[in-house]
Amino acid sequence: TISSALLSMALHSKGIKARSFSASQIAIRTTSSYSKAKILDVDAKKILDVLENDTIPIITGFQGITEGGDITTLGRGGSDATAVAIAAQINANRCDIYTDVDGIFTTDPNIVSNAKKLDSITMEEMLELAGQGAKVVQTRAVEFANKYHVPVRVLSSFNDGSGTLISLKDESMENALVSGIASQKDQVKFTLHSVGDIPGTAFKILGPISEAEVEVDVIVQNVSIDGKTDFTFTVSNEDQETVKKILSVIKDEINYKELIINPDIAKVSLVGAGMRSQSG
């Protein structure tokens, strides 16, 4: 909120009309999950009124309000999601997101020095990259862009350049076997050994975890032997204690024989629309 006010003052000093807004002033409505809230709706009327008066609206990008008027925060990358949601509501032709990098790269340039910048990438591929650990654009921002058909361009705040365009369809990328590689560290693998292989078991395990706003990533269920199976899934390390408590509570209902926890694992993912049509 302070930053948006300061930016507004800086623009005024340059003779540019601007006005800062908090989430409550704009009515960015979210779920009530503090620090992990999800945007439900954005009231675009006030934004459009300001734009019609040739004034630049500057909006805090990581906040929201519940139906009851309580302030929430959107978590890491929440400003990306806010920007795309607002762009969708005001029918913008495109949403530009300025970051500390020059665009979307084939992999993390901080890890691989010869990573190449992509001129364009499809929404589908960007969703996969973001979901598998690429941190340039937040996953929910790409989901909004895909749902409301808002092209997104990722640009550098520090360097001039064309950045990377995230579009609904990019003909030049369709034949690319692999368009990017993403990695996620600090993952935890949970394995419930010898779970009853009966309908509804997965829901009984994952349902309470979902209600706790924990995102489950990889899910693997082994082939059943004598009516028993091993159920494995991964979550972020920051959610480890929450998941442990949940599995302890439902142990008698699920009736698993043993809980095996493997912390500090990493995942590497290859993403590319071209792999869909490739064998092997």
List PLM regions with ranges.
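Nucleotide/pyrophosphate-binding catalytic subdomain
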Residues: 1-142, 222, 234, 260
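Conserved dinucleotide-binding and phosphotransfer motif residues
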Residues: 14, 148, 212
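Conserved beta-strand termini and adjacent loop/short-helix elements that scaffold enzyme active sites
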Residues: 21-23, 155-157, 219
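Short hydrophobic alpha-helical runs that function as membrane-insertion/retention elements
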Residues: 94-98, 152-154, 217
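A conserved regulatory-domain signal marking ACT and ACT-like small-molecule sensing domains
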Residues: 163-280
